Amino acid sequence: MAELTIDPASIRKALDDFVSSYKPSDTPTQEVGYVATAGDGIAHVTGLPGCMANELLTFEDGTLGLAFNLDAREIGVVILGDFAGIEEGQEVRRTGEVLSVPVGDGYLGRVVDPLGKPIDGLGEIQNIEGRRILEAQAPDVMHRHPVDEPLSTGLKAIDAMTPIGRGQRQLIIGDRQTGKTAIAIDTIINQKANWESGDPKKQVRCIYVAIGQKGSTIASVKQSLEDAGAMEYTTIVASPAADSAGFKYIAPYTGSAIGQHWMYNGKHVLIVFDDLSKQAEAYRSISLLLRRPPGREAYPGDVFYLHSRLLERCAKVSDDLGGGSMTGLPIVETKANDVSAYIPTNVISITDGQIFLQSDLFNANQRPAVDVGISVSRVGGAAQTKALKKVSGTLKISLAQYRSLESFAMFASDLDAASKAQLTRGAHLTELLKQPQFHPYSPEQEVVSVWTGTHGKLDDLDLKDVLPFEQGLLDYIDHNTDILKTIRETEEFTADTEAALDKAVDEFRSTFVSGSGKPLEEKKVESVKAAPVDQEKIVAGEK
C-alpha cells in the first residue's frame, strides 16, 4: 500500500485554483422584517436595517406601506390601503423604490386612486408615458417665468377683481357650504372652449383632487363635469372619507405628479386640491399615531412644509423647459369665518392670493359669495387681458367703499346726493356680480358686463331687473354688433370700441321692458362725485 503524503504546495495550488474560479451564487438576497404591531393604518416593523426614508415596503398580502419613521429598533410604516389583513408577525419586505405613479395623456377622462390605479370601471389606463415620483422637487427660481398669462374662471367677480394667472397659486377659503367647490368646478368647465380650439398654447388639462369627501359628493362632481363635457380633459384623483389616512396624505402629491409631467412637456395644467384641511388632518393623525411631537392645534411641527412643498410645484416654467404651467387652486375650510387659524394662515402665506367666501353673503343669496375686502390676487393686472384690466380698474374700490358706506348708512337719517348715488351704484354692481353655477362668461362678455355696471348704465334699474337687462344686452350685442368679436380678437378695449358699446347700450335700453312691464325712462345718471361744499371766505383785515 502506497504511503499517503501531504504536499503543502499541492494544497495551496488547489485552493488558489478554487478561489480564482469561484463565482458567487445568483440567488438574490433580500432583507426581511416582521410586523411588531399594526392598527389604525399604522404598522411598527422590526428588522430591515437598510430601509430608507419614504421607501416603499410590501406586506404579505401585497399591501404597500411607506417608511415614515426610522427609529433605532423599529420602523414606523404608513399603510397605503386596507390594513385589516395585516397582523403581528407577518413578513415585510423592502422594494428599494420610492413612491411613484404612472403619468401620461391616458389619465384624461379617468378617475384614479392615490396610487394611480383606475377606480371608474373603464379598464386599465392606456397611453402611459412613464412614471414620476411623488416627492418631486419644485422648479427653482431660475427655471420659472413670471405669471403674465390669464387663466379665465368665467366668473365675473373673480376675473375682474381677483384675477388668476397661469402658474399662480390662488387659495379658495371659506366656511363649509359657501360655494368653494362650485368655483373650482366652474373654472374647470370654463376651460372647455380652450380645449375645443385645438391650440396647445390655449388648452388646459385639469386635475381635480378630492380629499376626504363623501363618495357621493365625488360622484356628483364627476357627473357635473360629464354633463358639461369637461371630463374629456379632466382627471379626478379620489381619496374619499372611507380611505385610510395614508391615502388622504399622498393624494395631492399624486395629482401634482401627474400635472408636473404635462407642465414639463410644455402644456398648461389646472389642479384643484379639495381640500387641504382634510389632508392636514390626515397627516396629523398619522403623526400622532407614530408618536411625533405635537405642536399648535396638535399638528406636527412640519405641517407648513407639508403644504409648501406641494404648492411650490405650481409654477409657470421658463421657455427653456417648454414654457408650460401648472395653476393651483387649493381649497381650505374655515370654522366660523376664522382665517387666523393655523392651517388657513399657513396656506395664505404660501399662495399668491386668496378668494375668501363669506357665509353671510352666501346666505344673503350673493353667489359667488366673494368678500371683496379680504380677497386679493398678488399677481393682479398681470393676469388680466388689457380690455378687462381697463374696465375693472375702479370696480373693487367702488365695492369696498360701498360696503363701508352701507354700514354707516344704517345709522344715518339723511345722506347727501353723492352718498345716495354711491349706494345705488354699489347695490347695482353687487347685483351684477351674481352668477348662477355652471354658467361661465367669456372674457369679452365680462368686459361688456363690467363696463356697463361701472359706467352707471344700470343705476336707474330696479335691482331685480339688473341680471335680465345684462343677459338681454349681451344677446343684443352678440347678434347686432361686432363688439364681442373685436374684444375677443384684439383683447383690447379701444375708444372706438367703447363708443360703439355706449351706443349699443343706449339702443338696447330703448327696447328693454322692465319686470313691471314698463319701458325704461331716460334718466340722467347721477354723478358719484362729492358735491362741492360752500365755505365762508375770510378776507384779511375784515372785521
From Swiss-Prot:
<dbReference type="Pfam" id="PF00306">
    <property type="entry name" value="ATP-synt_ab_C"/>
</dbReference>
<dbReference type="GO" id="GO:0045259">
    <property type="term" value="C:proton-transporting ATP synthase complex"/>
</dbReference>
<dbReference type="InterPro" id="IPR020003">
    <property type="entry name" value="ATPase_a/bsu_AS"/>
</dbReference>
<keyword id="KW-1278">Translocase</keyword>
<dbReference type="InterPro" id="IPR000793">
    <property type="entry name" value="ATP_synth_asu_C"/>
</dbReference>
<keyword id="KW-0375">Hydrogen ion transport</keyword>
<keyword id="KW-0406">Ion transport</keyword>
<dbReference type="InterPro" id="IPR023366">
    <property type="entry name" value="ATP_synth_asu-like_sf"/>
</dbReference>
<keyword id="KW-0472">Membrane</keyword>
<dbReference type="Pfam" id="PF00006">
    <property type="entry name" value="ATP-synt_ab"/>
</dbReference>
<dbReference type="InterPro" id="IPR033732">
    <property type="entry name" value="ATP_synth_F1_a_nt-bd_dom"/>
</dbReference>
<keyword id="KW-0547">Nucleotide-binding</keyword>
<dbReference type="GO" id="GO:0005886">
    <property type="term" value="C:plasma membrane"/>
</dbReference>
<keyword id="KW-0067">ATP-binding</keyword>
<dbReference type="Pfam" id="PF02874">
    <property type="entry name" value="ATP-synt_ab_N"/>
</dbReference>
<dbReference type="GO" id="GO:0005524">
    <property type="term" value="F:ATP binding"/>
</dbReference>
<comment type="function">
    <text>Produces ATP from ADP in the presence of a proton gradient across the membrane. The alpha chain is a regulatory subunit.</text>
</comment>
<dbReference type="GO" id="GO:0046933">
    <property type="term" value="F:proton-transporting ATP synthase activity, rotational mechanism"/>
</dbReference>
<dbReference type="InterPro" id="IPR005294">
    <property type="entry name" value="ATP_synth_F1_asu"/>
</dbReference>
<dbReference type="InterPro" id="IPR000194">
    <property type="entry name" value="ATPase_F1/V1/A1_a/bsu_nucl-bd"/>
</dbReference>
<dbReference type="InterPro" id="IPR027417">
    <property type="entry name" value="P-loop_NTPase"/>
</dbReference>
<comment type="similarity">
    <text>Belongs to the ATPase alpha/beta chains family.</text>
</comment>
<dbReference type="InterPro" id="IPR038376">
    <property type="entry name" value="ATP_synth_asu_C_sf"/>
</dbReference>
<protein>
    <recommendedName>
        <fullName>ATP synthase subunit alpha</fullName>
        <ecNumber>7.1.2.2</ecNumber>
    </recommendedName>
</protein>
<dbReference type="InterPro" id="IPR036121">
    <property type="entry name" value="ATPase_F1/V1/A1_a/bsu_N_sf"/>
</dbReference>
<keyword id="KW-0139">CF(1)</keyword>
<comment type="subunit">
    <text>F-type ATPases have 2 components, CF(1) - the catalytic core - and CF(0) - the membrane proton channel. CF(1) has five subunits: alpha(3), beta(3), gamma(1), delta(1), epsilon(1). CF(0) has three main subunits: a(1), b(2) and c(9-12). The alpha and beta chains form an alternating ring which encloses part of the gamma chain. CF(1) is attached to CF(0) by a central stalk formed by the gamma and epsilon chains, while a peripheral stalk is formed by the delta and b chains.</text>
</comment>
<dbReference type="InterPro" id="IPR004100">
    <property type="entry name" value="ATPase_F1/V1/A1_a/bsu_N"/>
</dbReference>
<feature type="binding site">
    <location>
        <begin position="174"/>
        <end position="181"/>
    </location>
    <ligand>
        <name>ATP</name>
    </ligand>
</feature>
<keyword id="KW-1003">Cell membrane</keyword>
<keyword id="KW-0813">Transport</keyword>
<dbReference type="GO" id="GO:0043531">
    <property type="term" value="F:ADP binding"/>
</dbReference>
<keyword id="KW-0066">ATP synthesis</keyword>
<feature type="site" description="Required for activity">
    <location>
        <position position="375"/>
    </location>
</feature>
